[in-house]
Amino acid sequence: MKGFYQWYRKHITGAIFAGLILGILTGLFLADKFEVVLTATSALGSIYMNALNMMIFPLVFCSIVMGIASIGSAKTTGKITGAAMLFFLCTTALASFMGLIIPRLIHLGRGVKFEMATSDIQATKMDSILDTVKSLIPSNPVKAFAGGNMLQVLVFSLVIGFTLIAIGEKGEPLLKVIDSLNEVCLKIISTVMYFTPIGVFCTIVPVVEANGTSTIVSLATQLVILYIAFFGFALVVYGAAVKVLGKTSPIRFFRAIMPAALNAFGTCSSSATIPLSKQCVEDELGVSNQVSSITIPLGATVNMDAVSILMSFMIMFFANACNVNISISMMVLVLLANVLLSVGTPGIPGGAIASFAALATMAGLPAGVMGVYISINTLCDMGATCVNVIGDMAGCVVLQEQIDIEA
C-alpha cells in the first residue's frame, strides 16, 4: 500500500491528465446515454468542490497574514529587500492590469458557452466605487467568512497582519497559532488534492455533456492565448526593465537565464530552481551574491507576475463563457485582490487553485468553473512558473545596477 501511495504521488500529474481525457470521453459518448453516469459524476464532483472550497477562506486569511508578517520581518535585510519588493509589486500590478484589460479588449471567451449551475457562494456586489469603499471594512468578520465576502476577508487579513507587525513580540503567540492553522489548511487542501484526478473526471463530465466539443476547442485556444501573454509579458516588460533599469542587453539576459527558465518550466517550482537561478545571474550576468541571495529567494516567494496574468485571464474567460458581467468597478476589485493574493499565497501546494477559487467567488462565477480550471492547471503552471523565475532574475539585474552595494 505504501508503495502504491509513493507511486501515485509521483505520477499524480499523469493521473490528472488521464482523468481529464476520460472525463471528456465520458461526457461525449456516455453521459447522454446513461443518466446514472451524469447523476453520479455531478454528485461526486460537487462533493470534491465542496471539500476544496471548505478551506479556501481560512487559507486565504492565514496565508496573507503570514505573508505580511514575513515581509515585515524581512525589513531587517535592508534596502535590497525593500527595492526588490517594490520591483516585484510593480510588475505584479502591471501583470494583473494587463491580464484584465487584454481579455476584455479581445473579448476572450466570447462565443463560448458553458452551461453550469450558479455558484452557491454569494458574489461580491460592486454597484459603484462608493459602494466599494463602504464595503471594505467588515462590521462582523465572522459574517464576512460565513457569507463568502472575499473582499472583506482580504481587508480583515491585512488589518490583522499589519497589526501583528506593529505590536511586535506581543503578537508572536497569535502569529504561531495562525501559522499552525495555515499548516492545517495546507495539509487538508493537499489531502483533497490527492483526489484531484477523480475530481477532475467528475467535474468535467457534466461540462462536456452540456457543451460538447466546444469545451475542448475553447480550452485549447485559451491555453495558446495564455502562453502568448506569458512570454509576451516576459519579453516586453522584463526585457525593457533589464535594458532601461539594468543597463543590460535583453538578448544577453535571455540567453544567460535560459537554463534556469527551462528548469522552472519542467519542474513547476520556483523554489527548486533557486540554486540554478543564482548561478545564472552570478556567473553569466555579473550579479553579486549579496543581491542574488536576497532577491532570488524573495522573488520565489512573492513574485507571482505570471500567476496574476493567469488568474486575470481565467476570470475574464470564464466570465464571458458563463455570461457573467464584469463591471469596471469589479475589474478594479479583482485587480487589487489579484495583486494581494499573488503575494499572499506564494509557492504553496494548491496555491494557484486557492487564488482562483477566491477570485472566482468574488466575481460570482459558477462553482463548476473550478473543475474546468483544475483540469488544465498543470499546463498553465508550467508556463507561469517559467515566467515568474525569469522575473526573479530580471529583478536581480535591475537591483544590481540601481542599488549601491556596500562592500
What residue spans do the PLM features occupy?
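Signature of multi-pass transmembrane helix bundles
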Residues: 3-7, 13-17, 24-28, 32, ...
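Transmembrane helix boundary and interhelical junction motifs in multipass membrane proteins
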Residues: 56-60, 196-199, 269-277, 291, ...
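Short amphipathic alpha-helical coupling elements at transmembrane boundaries
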Residues: 39-50, 79, 135, 143, ...
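Helix-loop-helix junctions within the multi-pass membrane cores of secondary transporters/permeases
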Residues: 259-342, 396-397, 403-407
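Membrane-interface alpha-helices at helix entry/exit sites of multi-pass transporters
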Residues: 76-83, 187-194, 284-299, 328-330, ...
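Hydrophobic transmembrane alpha-helical segments of multi-pass transport and channel proteins
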Residues: 51, 89-93, 97, 227-232, ...
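Membrane-water interface of transmembrane alpha-helices in multipass transporters/channels
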Residues: 36-40, 78, 213-221, 248-258, ...
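Transmembrane alpha-helical segments and their short flanking loops
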Residues: 111, 312-407
